């Protein structure tokens, strides 16, 4: 090596900012949860769909500005120039599972059944500033019906969501699906004379803060404005008090039951045909949910659900977990939302020029998994494999035969493949793997046709709880005939 040639520094072994690694239980518990949800989706006639992690920026719905890269929010790059000249395509990692569905529905519209019912689960990527609990890669779990304008599709999605939450482990009474309709608000804005476009968008952005600032805060923001907690003044939308009242009546029209809420909404929309249509759709959804056995203790009409109203075109729904947990400061708080969805028409319109109605739901995978752990339904230490220790290198085939017999019996097992010189290190390895049992057979045991079966769980419990006399009287290691190895391990594992 030349003296003036600098030695390359070693790369840092670190996870990129905003990303994380998943180990053991994180992976298996997420898979178990998603498998349970998939069973419900499949039972409802939905088909799985896997799409590429990479889409063209054009298909994702991002538009190239007058700069060298697409809009912020996606991880995007431009391919090399195509042969013969010309710029290469802009590609990006998918930022959700809905945009790829739109592309698939347009690309294969001649082959897919209509309506097309699909579910999809997988990672998505956002090129956003990371923060506590906010990552650039995360999992989504979606189910959508494309091609049906019937509110029966919306009702079915809500019923399926309830079944999926329960099958995943959330008990009935610990969740509530709340349903609203964008058309009802459209009717109210129409009757107020609020034009579509920016005025209506300003109202939508304002009522989105209802759960944070309450009725009085929204009233101020719809009219003249208000000071926030920091003392800064936030400009209001500029509606008159008379114009603001119908919006507030809409937000606060929840009654004692669905019948009461629907009656209040009918009064709130007045003579608006659009609003009346929205109320009737909610009434139909409530009737169909009741027919499917989903009562008001599981799903209700609730006009205070406003998140997403700016995106959806019809019914909107949100699943909220109602049990309490302790926050980082030890204070009680309700767990909150774990899923949301609604009707969005125009899904395929960008590709075909034709409106295609669709409705769907997205479950927050990490949030639902955190909820199951908070309830003690997941998050326990995952049991590792039975570890077959190695006492004699020359007899490795015998040890592998033991592991193979255990696996054939449906028992997770492995042979220790590290340096077998120190037996204590083998037991430390088994402990680190959270192994329930260790198998030991030296030359003496092999000659006698026996094995030692060490119950590591019982051994740890005895060591922690028993007196020395009790410990001697309850050995956690037993000797059995080699032919009885599988039966003894089964007995210990229960």
Swiss-Prot record:
One of its GO terms (molecular function) is ATP binding. Pfam families: HGTP_anticodon (PF03129), tRNA-synt_His (PF13393). It is found in: Cytoplasm. Keywords: Aminoacyl-tRNA synthetase, ATP-binding, Cytoplasm, Ligase, Nucleotide-binding, Protein biosynthesis. Residues 1-20 are annotated as: Disordered. Gene3D superfamilies: Anticodon-binding domain, Bira Bifunctional Protein, Domain 2. It catalyses: tRNA(His) + L-histidine + ATP = L-histidyl-tRNA(His) + AMP + diphosphate + H(+). One of its GO terms (cellular component) is cytoplasm. PROSITE patterns: AA_TRNA_LIGASE_II. Its EC number is 6.1.1.21. It is an enzyme of class 6 (ligase). It comes from the Bacteria. Homodimer. Belongs to the class-II aminoacyl-tRNA synthetase family. This is Histidine--tRNA ligase. It comes from Paracoccus denitrificans (strain Pd 1222). The gene is hisS.
